[in-house]
From Swiss-Prot:
Compartments in which it is found: Cytoplasm
Signal sequence, renumbered to the chain: none
Protein's UniProt name: UvrABC system protein B
Domain Helicase C-terminal: 431-593
PANTHER family: UVRABC SYSTEM PROTEIN B
Family: Belongs to the UvrB family.
GO biological process, one term: nucleotide-excision repair
This protein's encoding gene: uvrB
Record keywords, A-Z: ATP-binding, Cytoplasm, DNA damage, DNA excision, DNA repair, Excision nuclease, Helicase, Hydrolase, Nucleotide-binding, SOS response
Function: The UvrABC repair system catalyzes the recognition and processing of DNA lesions. A damage recognition complex composed of 2 UvrA and 2 UvrB subunits scans DNA for abnormalities. Upon binding of the UvrA(2)B(2) complex to a putative damaged site, the DNA wraps around one UvrB monomer. DNA wrap is dependent on ATP binding by UvrB and probably causes local melting of the DNA helix, facilitating insertion of UvrB beta-hairpin between the DNA strands. Then UvrB probes one DNA strand for the presence of a lesion.
GO cellular component: cytoplasm; excinuclease repair complex
Residues that hold ATP according to the record: 39-46
Domain description: The beta-hairpin motif is involved in DNA binding.
Quaternary structure and interacting proteins, as annotated: Forms a heterotetramer with UvrA during the search for lesions. Interacts with UvrC in an incision complex.
């Protein structure tokens, strides 16, 4: 049966969307390698892309510049394509501090990290889906350019099974162990299996709502059943299926032995190099550290920092680029680069920073030179992938515009009929008093405000000044963690704050329809956040409200301001003429306030336990409550009392009565 994308939406494309969809689809059909979609804020670019994917019916990868935006895109596309595979691929670390050495202070910093098992499982689901299904969309962060296992090796570990298959139980269990599954007789977690009589129950290492039970009759598979992990109720059956590996880093014994031999050879050469340069400390250091790693590899098949030997494990030549998510994409895939004006510079910068850190480790004997091949893609390596690419932004960068020779697909009309905000220019003299007067008007109308300063100090001082004036104010800067920033912006939407002050509020990626006024202090100053693209992005923040307004505080009109204002007037003219022609009355976007986003998954602070859920319904979900109680009990038994208390407090908060 052909796997087709089926888009579910009560709305049809409107405004500029039909023309944009047609232009992009035609461009792909015409073999255009690069296209740019210039869509204003709130014009429904995600819906346009969803329609393009549905019409092309080709596997698609959407890359976003941060986990927050990636999570939003994932949620939106999952709702639009409930019958297809929509997957999520971001870093699986909740916390990560890389290994480093600082020569000036002779300080070695060991790698410390905390893995998120749910995100790890979601990554595996993404590469599994790309391997077997054409109707797959993957939403990824910059993690897409970091190393993954060799796709050839990974797919060799796929284990197809079917009813009637001749295989004895011992061979079946051995095969499960070879693809990374561990036996657990007590309680199954991801990547584990248990055997009871003639039945083998498997908890997949990837995202799955069910466990898999294989029933044997002698040396034959008699039945393959999908069962609920808790109740053990049968959810379905299969005549055949593919068991995917429990982890992406499943390594066979012969590969490990070959890897160890090659590492020993490089180690010998490196020791000789250090000795010939009279660096005896470095020679001894690299010898001790590497041999310790090799002992672990031989005994356990794993060592801390195993990624530094990925070149050997993957079978790559020195200097060969790493395997990444792109190597799992089918040949007819399409790549969408969201917020390309931010994503492209991010892709440019990742390799150099990584290499600079590792060079010190290699130079001072903490790592072998082959560790330099454990790296993200260089930008030119990313650019060499010949998949058609669509760059999406309200302010495309020079790179993507050069690739298309300035040709763009535009989307200026919003389905809501909203116009770009009015821009006013006020004097910088007495700008604080002027802002205070406007804030009083805003509060009277129960509308929200953003204020953009040029320094952290100014943001903090202005916020404190407003608080002294009894205005509910908060400030944001880059020392705040992502979920802290999102909590403040959620508070702004809910009315906990009347105004939020910050320097760069563009990277949040969160819609704020309640914001009808944006005040830009020192708009005529020079710098990154007052260039033309940044000013256009700032103006767009007030474009979700039917009487949005932006005030530039300036004593002169800079070229960036002039270009922004001209762009604003041009768009407003197109939008107002369209509204007049079609009798459309602009209307503020009404958007529900979603739970805060932490670690890239829509959830409350307890996301590490219960993943992405409609929290308002959780109290009535018996299966979910049972899972939480069970998890709480497990954590308590493992003496992880703080985490157990978190779950207990959450359950009490949503009204669940717990037995003592």
């Amino acid at each position: 049966m052909e796997e087709k994308f089926v888009l579910h939406s009560p709305f049809a494309p409107s405004g500029d969307q039909p023309e944009a969809i047609k232009a992009l689809v035609d461009g792909i059909d015409e073999k255009k390698e690069h296209q740019v979609l210039l869509g204003v804020t709130g014009s429904g670019k995600t819906f346009t892309i969803a329609n393009v994917i549905a019409q092309l019916n080709r596997p698609s990868l959407i890359i976003s510049h941060n986990k927050t935006l990636a999570s939003q895109l994932y949620s939106e596309l999952k709702a639009l394509f409930p019958d297809n595979r929509v997957e999520y691929f971001v870093s699986y670390f909740d916390f990560y501090k890389p290994e480093a050495y600082i020569p000036k202070s002779d300080l070695y910093i060991e790698k410390t990290s905390k893995n998120n098992k749910e995100l790890e499982a979601m990554r595996m689901s993404a590469i599994n889906a790309l391997s077997i299904r054409k109707d797959t969309i993957v939403v990824a962060s910059v993690a897409a350019i970091y190393g993954e296992s060799n796709p050839k090796h990974y797919r060799q570990n796929f284990f197809p099974i079917e009813v009637g298959m001749q295989i004895d139980r011992k061979s079946l269990l051995l095969k499960l162990s070879q693809i990374g599954y561990e036996r657990n007789r007590m309680e199954l977690n991801k990547g584990q299996f248990d055997v009871k009589g003639d039945s083998i129950e498997i908890c997949p290492g990837y995202v799955s709502d069910t466990n898999i039970r294989i029933d044997m009759f002698g040396n034959e598979i008699e039945a393959i059943t999908l069962i609920d992990p808790l109740s053990k109720n049968v959810e379905g059956s299969r005549k055949n299926m593919t068991l995917f590996p429990a982890t992406t880093y499943t390594v066979h014994e012969n590969t490990i032995q070959n890897t160890v031999d090659l590492i020993k050879q490089e180690l010998s050469e490196r020791i000789e190099y250090f000795k010939s340069h009279d660096k005896l400390l470095e020679a001894q250091r690299i010898k001790d550290r590497t041999l310790n790693d090799l002992d672990s590899l031989l005994e356990f098949g794993y060592t801390s920092g195993i990624e530094n030997y990925s070149r050997y494990l993957d079978g790559r030549a020195p200097g060969q680029r790493p395997y990444t998510l792109f190597d799992y994409l089918p040949d007819d895939s399409v790549i969408f680069i969201d917020e390309s004006h931010l994503m492209i510079p991010q892709l440019h910068g990742m390799h150099n920073g990584d290499r600079a850190r590792k060079l010190s480790l290699v130079e001072y004997g903490f790592r072998l030179p082959s560790a330099l091949d454990n790296r993200p893609l260089r930008f030119e390596e990313f650019a060499e992938f010949k998949f058609p690419k669509i760059y999406i932004s309200a302010t495309p960068g020079d790179y993507e515009l050069d690739l298309t020779h300035g040709e763009i697909v535009t989307q200026y009309i919003r389905p809501t009929g909203l116009l770009d905000p009015i821009i006013e220019i006020h004097s910088r003299d007495n700008q604080i008093e002027d802002i205070y007067d406007h804030l009083k008007e805003q509060i009277a109308k129960k509308e929200r405000t953003l204020i953009l300063t040029t320094t952290k100090k100014n943001a903090e001082e202005l916020s404190l000044f407003l608080q002294e004036k009894k205005i509910k104010s908060a400030y944001i800067h880059d020392r705040f963690k992502i979920f802290e920033r999102n909590e403040i912006l959620k508070g702004l939407r809910m009315g906990k704050f009347d105004v939020v002050v910050g320097i760069n509020l563009l990277k949040e990626g969160i819609d704020l329809p309640e914001v009808s006024l944006i005040c830009v202090l020192n708009a005529d100053s020079t710098g990154l956040m007052r260039d033309t693209r940044s000013l256009i992005q700032i103006v767009g923040r007030a474009a979700r409200n039917d009487h949005g307004k932006v005030i530039f505080y300036a004593n002169e009109i800079t070229s960036s301001m002039r270009e922004c204002i001209e762009d604003n007037l041009f768009k407003r003219k197109i939008q107002s003429e369209y509204n007049e022609k079609h009798n459309i009355i602009p209307k503020t976007i009404v958007k529900p306030i979603a739970p805060p986003i932490q670690n890239g998954i829509l959830s409350e602070d307890h996301s590490k336990y219960y993943g992405e859920k409609d929290l308002s319904q959780m109290k009535h979900n018996k299966k979910f409550i049972d899972q939480m109680v069970r998890k709480m009990t497990q954590l308590a038994k493992a003496n992880k009392f703080e985490e157990a208390i978190e779950i207990r407090d959450y359950l009490i908060e949503i009204g669940i009565e717990l037995d003592k």
